Amino acid sequence: MDAFTHSLNAQPGWPEFQRARLRRTRDFDDLDPSPNGEPEIFEFPIEIARQHDVVTLYLELLDTVSSAKSCEYYFRRYPFRGLPVSRHEHLSNVCEMFFGRFYQFKERLKKYSGAIAAASPGNDLDFGPFIKTFSTEFDRELRARHEIHHHRRFSDLAIDHIFISGLLADRRPGNGWNAEHLATYRKTTHEWALRAKNRGARLDAFMEAIAEATLHSCSHFLTIP
């Protein structure tokens, strides 16, 4: 990947385009979206553009894995003490974000397989069975994301108990419900954090397989001469 990225500097106009984009990002408050008519998209030659798609989409897959793994720490922390965001709401939101990462990975993987086919025509790489394996491995997460997107918010018995015990703690202070609420929340978030860590490790394994397959099918532009 690094070798290919460095090779782009030999493309006429690319280094200048990158510098101009960095300037626009740095000074975005002072500039129009496209100052002086500068193009916002760099046009590579078709072959280089297809190779560039492979690299950028691979990096997007890596970013999705990193985002899914970071959910472990969202589960571990409740940063809204004293604010109008309940523990129940925070936990539900993080669960939904976590599930969404697996759908995101699957959809990006489909797009990535198309980029591989375009950049390396005639290769014998078939992502179909691999995507099916991914769908089977993460079936629970993908089903939960589908349910959230099309029907209702995510909940389970533990999260529902956090919601109810929180209501009772507010309405019946000193009756033991606050301790019950906090204990259930700590136990449940610990379990979710562990799940995020374990599922993140499985995503890492999938990325290793993708990297090996990519190097095999795209060795003509992803190896160092």
Task: For every predicted segment, state its role.
Residues 95-135, 151, 155-156:
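Flexible secondary-structure boundary motifs
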Residues 1-55, 125-225:
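Acidic, Ser/Thr/Gly/Pro-rich intrinsically disordered interaction regions
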Residues 72-87, 116-119, 152, 217, ...:
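Secondary-structure edge/capping motif, primarily at the C-terminal ends of alpha-helices
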Residues 58, 62-65, 69-72, 99-102, ...:
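A structural signal for well-ordered alpha-helices, especially hydrophobic packing surfaces
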Residues 26-32, 38, 68-79, 109, ...:
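Extended amphipathic alpha-helical scaffold segments
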Residues 3-6, 81-89, 95, 103-105:
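Short N-terminal signal/transit or membrane-insertion segments
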Residues 51-92:
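A glycine-rich, hydrophobic loop/mini-helix early in the fold
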